[in-house]
Amino acid sequence: MVICNMEDASRYEGLHPLFPTLFAYMRSHDLLHEPTGRITIDGDRLFINNSAPECLAADKQIIEVHRRYIDVHFLLEGSETIGWKPTGECTALSQPYDAEKECALYAEPAQTYVTLHPGQIAIV
């Protein structure tokens, strides 16, 4: 997991070949005022799920695991607490991996929590 401000995101562009394109898009677009939904940048290789999720308290969250995509959270307003736990330590499977939804769900507490504020990014 990487946590940073948008101003520092360029330090992490070398972690994935599509990060420079993603971060450039995020810097140059007002995502808060874009319609919610999928924003396609490079087909299925790179896209943004622009959403306004209901943020749950840490004790009500479940663990979401991805296999194909990297999840990059970019907070636009308010605050959001997200949890993390090593995938190999997740045991309470509540939804098996679904390739179409690209996730599996585990109903158990995370090991670590971080609260994001506007302009902050979490790469999980």
Where is each model-derived feature located?
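A short, N-terminal "cap"/entry segment at the start of jelly-roll beta-barrel domains
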Residues: V2-N50, A57-V65
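Structural motif
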Residues: L46-F47, H73, I121
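Short, conserved beta-strand element in jelly-roll/cupin
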Residues: R68-E80, P86-G88, P96-Y106, L116
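Conserved metal-binding segment of the jelly-roll/cupin
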Residues: V114-V124
